[in-house]
Amino acid sequence: MAAELLEQPVLGSRRLSNILVALMVTIGGIGFLFASLSSYLGRDLLPLGHPAGLVFVPQGLIMGLYSLAAALLASYLWAVITINVGSGSNRFDRSAGVVTISRRGFRQPISVEIPIKDIQAVKVEVRDGFNTRRRVSLRVRGRRDMPLTRVGEPLPLAQLEQDGAELARFLGVNLEGL
């Protein structure tokens, strides 16, 4: 049974880099809020600088708007991290003759089923430079290429080649792009 089924988990947005960005935006938003309140109240609420000396109407008000924008952005980032958008699995079932690609969306799960007989090849893309792309995808008859790797940090080249070769061997199709 194990030889008939291959399941690959896919990492979503619950990564350390995303958590650090959300944390920095949250802390920055709180800092802008305290600076705005210090300007309004005329008292220093922050240990650094002297925000009480700022005139409220132009500077303090703008800092309050920055804190509102940071709160909205941080709320979105924490929601995406909590829901773990983009996580899921790639399930290859030879006995049923179907490939199921499932991901967790923002509002609802996303699932795509592809018959194995429609898969023409496993494609490995490597593009270095400013916009680096390293991904494994399925070349499907009558459709666009279906990406299988996670979005974000590129995989090491050795792991990318190994994953592509293992998948092509399992599905019995060609490996393209190397």
From Swiss-Prot:
Task: State the InterPro entries in the record.
Answer: PSI_Ycf4_assembly (IPR003359)
Give me the Gene Ontology terms describing cellular component.
photosystem I; plasma membrane-derived thylakoid membrane
Q: Which UniProt keywords apply?
A: Membrane, Photosynthesis, Thylakoid, Transmembrane, Transmembrane helix
Q: Which Pfam families match?
A: Ycf4
| Highest taxon of the lineage | Bacteria
Q: How does it sit in the membrane?
A: Multi-pass membrane protein
Gene Ontology annotations of biological process type: photosynthesis
User: Which spans are transmembrane here?
Assistant: 19-39, 61-81
Give the main location: membrane
Record function comment: Seems to be required for the assembly of the photosystem I complex.
**Family assignment?**
Belongs to the Ycf4 family.
Name of the molecule in the record: Photosystem I assembly protein Ycf4
Q: Which organism is it from?
A: Synechococcus sp. (strain CC9311)
Organism classification: Bacteria, Bacillati, Cyanobacteriota, Cyanophyceae, Synechococcales
